[in-house]
Amino acid sequence: EGSVKVDGFDILEEPEEVKKRIGYMPEFPPLYLDMTVQEYLNFVSDIKKIDRVTKKRSMEKIMDLVKIGDVRKRLIKNLSKGYRQRVGLAQALIGAPPVLILDEPTVGLDPKQIIEIRNLIKDLGKEHTIILSSHILPEVSAVCERVLIINKGKIVASDTPENLSKRLGDT
């Protein structure tokens, strides 16, 4: 029982307002492979009804932030897995949502790309609430300040990564 609010908006009473405040990157971002990076991000901006002035201003910032500006004119199908993940993250950032939900953001990346994406997530955590879904415990420890373990829909543990490691290591 209870209610869930995002940025002060109840998810049942004002779902459209809630959706505007959440950016989501699934494990396998649904990218249009025959679009360039810039075309795809413009397409997502249009879907999210971002006005032209805001779109132009924020697009450069987002591409710089996730380090994809140098591939903006390349077709997505010609990008590495790491760059595709960055494009997926960029689309989640469109509209400046205060909450980001990232599902297994480093799956399939090489070690260098994993470090880069983890550092990017930590940086994003300074300005966004990030909900990270991961089964990779070293990743959780590397990027999270707080961890919730959910089993069958129930929160079974909530603490810092360090404290959880100590508690779970002792059992």
Each language-model region and where it sits:
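Conserved ABC ATPase signature
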Residues: 75-79
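A short, proline-enriched helix->beta-strand linker immediately N-terminal to the Walker B motif
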Residues: 94-98
